[in-house]
Regions:
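Short hydrophobic-acidic sequence motifs that mark active-site Asp/Glu residues
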Residues: 64-66, 133
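Core segments of cupin and vicinal oxygen chelate
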Residues: 12-62
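Acetyl-CoA-dependent GNAT
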Residues: 69-75, 138-139
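Vicinal oxygen chelate
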Residues: 2, 7-14, 54-63, 70, 77-139, ...
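A generic structural micro-feature
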Residues: 3, 47-50, 81-84
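Hydrophobic side chains in well-ordered alpha-helices
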Residues: 19-22, 100-104
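Haloarchaeal acidic low-complexity proteome signature biased toward cell-envelope/secretome components but also
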Residues: 1-5, 10, 19, 29, ...
């Protein structure tokens, strides 16, 4: 069996334009591609009759983040809590965590101010406009 390699992290959003603006403005990520997909094969693959999706692929320093808004829109849910089983987050690295934190727009939700863990790692968790968790690490 061929060994798999990581391709992207996918994040489902309700408002693709708002999500793209957040990730490009907050993290200075570049948009690699924007496209829509529909048809019977796609609907079968996502197991939703008649589903279509609008996608944006973003470059996160060689890693790819895929934002996708489905139609029909998925039912909303509570934002994920980091400590709950099944919670997923994206980790993005910055050179200066304090400068990143100070430069955040007022509307960006943070779980705390930048912290240094017992292992010496400097981290900060923020939420995107959809409530998805993003870990920002200083490297």
């Amino acid at each position: 069996m061929p060994e798999p390699t990581a391709h992207h992290v996918g994040i489902t959003v309700a408002d693709l334009d708002r999500a793209v603006a957040f990730y490009t403005d907050t993290f200075d990520l570049d948009v690699l591609a924007e496209f829509s997909v529909g048809g019977e094969a796609f609907a079968d693959a996502v197991d939703v009759d008649g589903a279509t999706g609008s996608f944006a692929h973003l470059d996160a320093g060689g890693a790819r983040i895929e934002l996708v808004a489905y139609d029909p829109e998925a039912a909303g849910s509570d934002p994920p809590e980091l400590y709950r089983s099944g919670a997923v987050h994206v980790g993005l690295a910055v050179d200066d965590l304090d400068a990143f934190y100070e430069g955040l727009d007022d509307g960006v939700e943070t779980l705390s101010r930048p912290r240094t863990t017992e292992s010496g790692t400097r981290i900060l968790f923020v939420r995107d406009p959809e409530g998805n968790l993003i870990e920002v690490l200083e490297v």
